[in-house]
Regions:
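Asp-based, Mg2+/Mn2+-dependent phosphohydrolase catalytic module
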Residues: 2-25, 33-35, 42, 47-50, ...
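Polytopic endomembrane small-metabolite transporters, centered on the Drug/Metabolite Transporter
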Residues: 88-90
Length: 342
């Protein structure tokens, strides 16, 4: 793919909820953390919807069904129906269905979300390698997924059965912090078998295809908290993205982002959907946003001025990404970020 290398966050003269017809929202770390809504999420989403924006919830978490996800969101005060939810389970089920016959048995290492998605594609979920599956699919199964389930996957894969994974997120955010995600479980099976799975979830094309097919979005905006899934998925799909800082990405990771991990816009939380985005402009040897000016020095990023912390971060992104070009920035931004409280 040939794309222009992004060297700064973009500005927007109108609210993002007006500039785009559909928000493709990640869930964990964006809308909620654990069982609780993230601050400002409920009101921001209600305002965006009232203004005519279609909201779709796109998650790499394959554990729960779209019905269950919609129910949870509705309980949090975000009215949602199952058709508003797109999961990596649905994407991987479509991928499998394109390679095996209707009615084929598929060994499931994961939760109910995978089973429901497979049945929707006319496939039969099974639990044992002895059930003669023609494929193995692995997705997040929650904290109670046992070692014996990984063993069943290994037994089937050793017989030459193709292996699929809903996603490879190494971590998942929760109310108590960061926990192992499906990617960590996939690594267990990979190491044990030496096999490589076909992966459907963000940032790969099968998930983007599933999302566009189900939403019909024409001017989508990906909204996420992860650089290596949400933002890279938007890059691969050639659509714009908004990074919110309510999940796993911190300022240092953002400054060091290679081109495929650089978002179109950066904001603190989902309130960023409701506003225009400030311009980052060249200023001498550096870049200015709001009251801050950032420059790339010999070994570090330097920041002068005062104002909103997010404006300082946007200016630092421009200095870092411009200095790095097509690579990841190696300049130290620690002092500048500390000055912003980030």
């Amino acid at each position: 793919m040939s794309q222009t290398v992004r060297t700064r966050p973009e500005g927007s003269g109108q609210a993002l909820s007006e500039a785009y017809d559909t928000a493709l929202l990640d869930l964990d770390g964006v809308v909620y953390a654990g069982g609780d809504a993230i601050a400002h999420a409920v009101d921001s989403l209600a305002t965006a919807r009232a203004g005519g924006m279609h909201l779709a919830y796109v998650t790499n978490n394959a554990l729960r069904t779209p019905d269950a996800v919609a129910g949870h969101l509705t309980e949090l005060g975000i009215p949602t129906v199952a058709s508003d939810v797109i999961t990596s389970a649905q994407a991987v089920a479509r991928l499998i269905s394109e390679q095996v016959p209707v009615g084929a048995r598929v060994l499931v290492i994961g939760g109910e979300g995978l089973r429901v998605a497979l049945r929707e594609r006319g496939l039969e979920p099974v639990d044992s390698a002895e059930d003669e599956p023609v494929a193995v699919v692995q997705g997040y199964g929650g904290p109670d997924l046992t070692w014996s389930r990984f063993a069943e996957a290994c037994y089937a894969i050793a017989r030459g059965v193709p292996w699929f994974a809903s996603n490879t997120d190494l971590t998942i955010p929760g109310a108590r912090g960061i926990a192992p995600g499906n990617g960590a479980a996939v690594e267990v099976v990979r190491i044990a078998t030496g096999a490589e799975p076909q992966v459907a979830g963000k940032p790969l094309p099968p998930m983007h295809r599933e999302t566009i097919l189900r939403t019909g979005a024409e001017r989508p905006l990906v909204v996420g908290d992860r650089l290596d899934t949400d933002i890279e998925g938007a890059f691969n799909g050639e659509v714009d993205s908004l990074l919110v800082l309510t999940g796993v990405t911190d300022g240092a990771q953002l400054l060091a982002a290679p081109p495929q991990h650089r978002p179109t816009y950066v904001d603190a939380d989902l309130r960023g959907m409701l506003t225009g985005q400030p311009e980052v402009v060249e200023a001498g040897d550096g870049f200015r946003c709001g009251g801050w000016t950032a420059t790339a020095g010999g070994q570090e990023l330097e920041l002068t001025g005062e104002g909103e912390a997010l404006d300082g971060l946007r200016a630092l992104c421009a200095a870092a990404w411009t200095a790095a070009g097509e690579s990841a920035c190696e300049l130290d931004g620690g002092k500048a970020l500390a000055r912003l409280g980030l």
